[in-house]
Amino acid sequence: MPRASAEPKVRVDVLADEADDRASLYEATVRRLQGEVKELPAVWLYDERGSRLYEEITRLQEYYLPRREGEILRAHGSAIARLTQAHTLVELGAGTVKNTRLVLDALETGGTLERFVPLDVSEQTLRASAQAIASAYPQVFVHAIVGDFERHLGALPGGGRRLIAFLGSTIGNLYPEQRGAFLGTLAAMLARDDALLVGVDLVKDPARLEAAYNDSRGVTEEFVRNALTAVNRELRATFDQRRFVYEARWDSADNWMDIGLRARQAHTVSIERLGLDLAFEEREPLRVEISSKFRREQFEREAARARLRVESWWTDAAADFAVALLRV
């Protein structure tokens, strides 16, 4: 049974089990490191220091994504509220809930908002966000869920019209087959009056895309390298930062940014806790994350395969980013 705690206007359900989550992460780490392309699960990016670095990234001039998404939500928030008339706003992968506040504001102004349900893996961050939202929106009941958006969608409360928000182009961090499965799961749980709001980064000049992940201050590189530090600390690994060069490049075949590190020379890394020795060849990549970029027709095809239809599509003035409203 999930642990629950209740305070005025705030409820927090903890579905994540730390021991199970660790075991799953270790298994995924072994599987991905032994894949055709060596890869670290992106979870390793988000320890305490990594989360702080990511917050810094969102404020960088080169990293346009949150600004463009915010521009869209400010311009079209009233339309989103009018079209959905949502009683409940669900935020998947809530984190610090920045742009989500723009949707909350629009729904509050529209007079329909009753409940906010943020779901995120970080209990500490989620509790802080839940309290902040409860203070800022005293008439809204906050039901926070500590869990994984790929595993705990079934725990989302029903009742009334729901708007499920998946913002920040987080959907681009999923591989195509993962996206298809995830959208299919969402479609199966959506009622006729529910809607899905998704933020997607759009295909554009590769130079601009690569600049967004190769910032002049090197914060993104530091963020990615911190994943090695986290793995060394927790798994007793021997990743040597000096033996890897940072690389974030546009892959035009797959329409994604490929973000990670590349071995400077052949060497072996030992991961004691996993009982694993990894042999790297010279210039062999170690992927840490992908960030897929979309064209409207491509996104609509993927949605249709999951039995979802795009009802509305909004972009910023520069057509850098889009927010899509979908229904079953």
Residue ranges and their predicted role:
Residues 2-44, 51:
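N-terminal auxiliary segments of SAM/dcSAM-dependent transferases
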Residues 18, 37-86:
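Class I SAM-dependent methyltransferase Rossmann-like catalytic core
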Residues 86-95:
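Conserved class I S-adenosyl-L-methionine
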Residues 97-101:
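Glycine-rich SAM-binding Motif I of class I
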Residues 104-151:
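Class I SAM-dependent methyltransferase SAM/SAH-binding core
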Residues 173-185:
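A short, conserved alpha-helix within the catalytic core of class I
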Residues 188-203:
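Conserved beta-strand signature within the Rossmann-like core of class I S-adenosyl-L-methionine
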Residues 208-292, 296, 300-306:
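Substrate-binding/catalytic lobe of Class I Rossmann-like enzymes that use SAM or dcSAM, i.e.
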